[in-house]
Design a protein with these regions (language model features):
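N-terminal secretory signal peptides that target proteins for export/translocation
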Residues: 1-23
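Intrinsic structural disorder/low-complexity segments
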Residues: 8-10, 46, 241
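The canonical Cys-X-X-Cys-His
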Residues: 230-242
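Extracytoplasmic c-type cytochrome modules immediately beyond a signal peptide or single-pass transmembrane anchor
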Residues: 43-229, 243-270
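Extended, compositionally biased low-complexity polar/Lys-Gly-rich tracts
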Residues: 26-27, 150
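Contiguous N-terminal and early-domain "leader" segments and peripheral loops that mark the onset or edge
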Residues: 13-16, 32-34, 46
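Bacterial N-terminal signal peptides
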Residues: 28-40
Length: 270
């Protein structure tokens, strides 16, 4: 073999090594990129899971606190009792008891993340503020119906929560347009779409929440809508006969147990 042939083969080998080295670098870049993408996806999934968990806790506590108001309507509306001992502290204790009974665990704030503690603490503060603000009305002698019903309590509590935690989260109760009594509860386009295309369809699993990451007020947010259905205790105001005036002088909706009554809407900003 001549020197020229040897040199040619040497050059070819060098090019092959260089090519392999380039491919190796490319694969390294692809691998790093894949690992980075996988890490980002894992972090996103973890964030969604965390938001879903705190969303459920907030919704469950709202439901528990509404149940306390519902269960105490007889006491609240008793015109013969002055100081009803319906303090905000006792109220929160009763809500915690119902939460435990329904969920199976207590709300141990010390075991939660800093953000989740802030949100749940904000909700509890809001509950206390609303009950404290209505003490004079609740304890008014000579007046029967006070108007302090579950729906009013929930709306006021959610508004107080929004004032406290506005930069981190929002909660409100909404419903299909034909069931909305208060204009403030009208569904926004996103909520209306989910109510009509998911919750009101026969194929949607009863009780299943809908979640989505979307833009809300110019910020990326985790949105969660949890369906609510009429219970027996709801029918005094929302049952039959449809059109009959309830205790608030509003026409009943004609609902029956199990019908979709509305939804709890939760926004958690990223």
């Amino acid at each position: 073999m001549g020197l020229d042939q040897i040199q040619t083969k040497t050059n070819l080998c060098s090019k092959a090594v260089s090519t392999l080295s380039g491919l190796s670098s490319l694969w390294k870049l692809l691998l790093v990129g894949a690992l980075g993408l996988g890490s980002a996806m894992t972090q996103t999934a973890a964030a969604v899971d965390a938001d879903f968990t705190i969303g459920n806790k907030l919704a469950d506590m709202l439901r528990a606190s509404r149940s306390v108001v519902s269960a105490n309507q007889g006491l609240i509306n008793d015109p013969d009792i002055g100081d009803k001992q319906f303090s905000s502290e006792k109220f929160v204790q009763a809500a915690d008891a119902i939460y435990l009974k329904r969920v199976g665990t207590t709300l141990n704030l010390s075991e939660l993340s800093e953000r989740d503690r802030r949100l749940l603490d904000a909700q509890r503060r809001a509950m206390r503020l609303v009950v404290d603000d209505h003490q004079a009305e609740i304890n008014r002698i000579g007046v029967g119906f006070k108007g302090f019903i579950p729906a009013i309590f929930a709306r006021l509590t959610n508004e107080e929560f929004g004032a406290i935690a506005a930069q981190e989260a929002r909660i409100r109760v909404t419903a299909p347009p034909d069931l909305v009594r208060n204009r403030k509860a009208r569904p926004d386009p996103w909520e209306k779409n989910i109510l009509e295309t998911r919750f009101l369809t026969s194929g949607w699993p009863k009780g299943k929440a809908f979640t989505e990451e979307v833009e809300f007020e110019g910020r990326l947010a985790f949105r969660m809508l949890l369906p609510e259905y009429y219970r027996e205790s709801c029918l005094a105001c929302h049952g039959t006969p449809k059109g009959e005036l309830d205790i608030t002088s509003y026409p009943k909706e004609g609902g029956i147990v199990g019908d979709l009554a509305g939804a709890i809407s939760i926004v958690i900003f990223r």
